[in-house]
Amino acid sequence: MCGITGFVSAPAAHDELTRAVRGMCGALEHRGPDDAGEWVDAAHGVAIGFRRLAIIDLSPAGHQPMVSASGRYVATLNGEIYNFEELRRELRAGGLAPEFRGHSDTEVMLAAFEAWGIDAVARFNGMFAIAVWDRRERRLYLVRDRMGVKPLYYGFAGDTFVYGSELKALRRHPGFDARIDRNALRLYLSFLYVPAPFSIYEGIAKAMPGTIVTLDPDARTTRTTVYWSARDAAIAGTRDRFAGTEEEASHELEALLRDAIRIRMVADVPIGVFLSGGVDSSLVTALMQAESATPVKSFSIGFDDIGYNEAPYAAAVARHLGTDHTELTVHERDALDVIPRLGRMYDEPFADSSQIPTHLVSALARRHVTVSLSGDGGDELFGGYTRYFVGQRLFRWIARTPRGMRPALGRALGRIPARMYDRLRPRLGERAHKVARVLQANDIDAMYFELVSHWTAAAWPPHSTAVAPVLDRAQWPALADPVERMMYFDQISYLPDDILAKVDRASMAASLESREPLLDYRLVEFAWRLPLSMKVRAGKGKRVLRRVLYRYVPEELIERPKMGFGIPLGAWLRGPLRDWAEPLLSEAALRKHGLLDPAPIRAKWNEHLAGRYDWNFYLWGILMLQVWLDAAA
């Protein structure tokens, strides 16, 4: 895993272009502390930069930017192409292989481009953001992996086309204009992340997963082509449903999982795994251990608050599997130490509070390994979120309630303080108040968007009108089951723009590579073939995943209410984080940048402090925006 950046401008002096691209690379040093490189074509105004975290082929033969054997292509690769050995064999069998100088996946990638053109990306199985300059055709290609594991931004800074793994690299270009896109800000306030293709800056976009962006420097235009899409996977899968039994499906799934994990264990550096003790991470850990002749290094974190502490469950799974397990207990002080860095770590507003423990467990793992596997993606592919199996029941209940009674019922539920619900069950207050807010939904899709949305029109910045393309249900596949529609939305938006963005920035800030075997595209396509009943049934998700897991780990070590990977944010905002949050939520601070109306925010802050409501998600969204605005300034 590394950092890529660069630009295409008018022809300029070699030294001028080199200085500019080195400055951009400097912003990505955390992504690649082991090496740096640049390639410049002054006559055509091209500058390509790279920061390297050495994982495969640690020798100088793995240095980037790398030039293909014929000299036609110059490329940088952030991420991994896991099937590179298979591609190398295919190239050799077809007489298409050059004399390889090393054994890196980047060199195989370039040979594939020479043999099959840029469309070779459809043969790659991996997580990647790729920049390729075609010297013969004078075209720049930017490629993002199928699921959006690796980030990639691009756009124009004046007359110069710029791109990079993170926005902070683009900001270093001398021509960059850091104007906030109010439409992107509106979407952020709704979802607490900026959905693709938006970025927080005007004129800068996120490359969509599964796409190739082609720049024509002469016309100063870009064209986007799709080489894979979750939409096509969903359509194909639901048309060709798996016809066997659940037991047969579990064996086919297990074979795919084992291969996905096997190819992700290839590295020339130490490798480990994040283990929370839940279904997904326990399954990845179990299959890693099955593939390993020595104890796998596993890592987990815990909390003093029992409602959030999964560490004992992770430790029990680790003992059963015989891993080399390391655990860290997170205290309020640890969170306070991380928070000041979040504005720069996430270089656009981002407010998933699990960003804190994700970074802490990444930093813990980095003391021992350079690569760590995770269980991310299991919830979205196999129906793990509570909202999937509760959503349908909730909407049926809402639909039976006379429309005229719903507002009053919502107000009644909302008036009961969150702390009173929490006496019955941890975190019940947060969920009860969310139910109170969705009682106005007209259909289950609208209810779902209400469930995953936060700030509404009262807090949106003026002159903002955008709707994210992913929200255009007319473009969605025709999925009859509303639960599958929820899962589809999560796969195309929440997964890449929240979960994977969180993991990428949190791990890369610690110079750790994270790999997600459950997001192997073969598993995604297989998951869409499975009937929903093999994923969600009788109030429980991930049924077929559990069936595989219980061949390796006893059921009693796993079965418990789902916690999620979070922190006790609501309580911390009333307690140890209050002194930090208060100045950021003052009326003066909220007016400082001219983007927010303090009134609804101050009202929620006061209600939260009084314990009447649990507004932790809403408030964290504003706090992270404020932290980011201050860091960006």
Question: How should these model regions be labeled?
Answer:
Residues M1-I4, A42, L96, D119, ...:
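Adenosyl-5′-phosphate
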Residues M1-Y346, T358, S362, R551-L557, ...:
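Cysteine-centered catalytic environments shared across enzyme families
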Residues E38, P151-Y154, L283-A286, L381, ...:
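Generic hydrophobic alpha-helical membrane-span motif
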Residues A43-I48, T160-G164, V390-A399, L530-G539:
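Compositionally biased, low-complexity linear motifs
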Residues P340-R344, R366, R387-V390, W572-R574:
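Short low-complexity, flexible loop/linker segments enriched in glycine and/or proline
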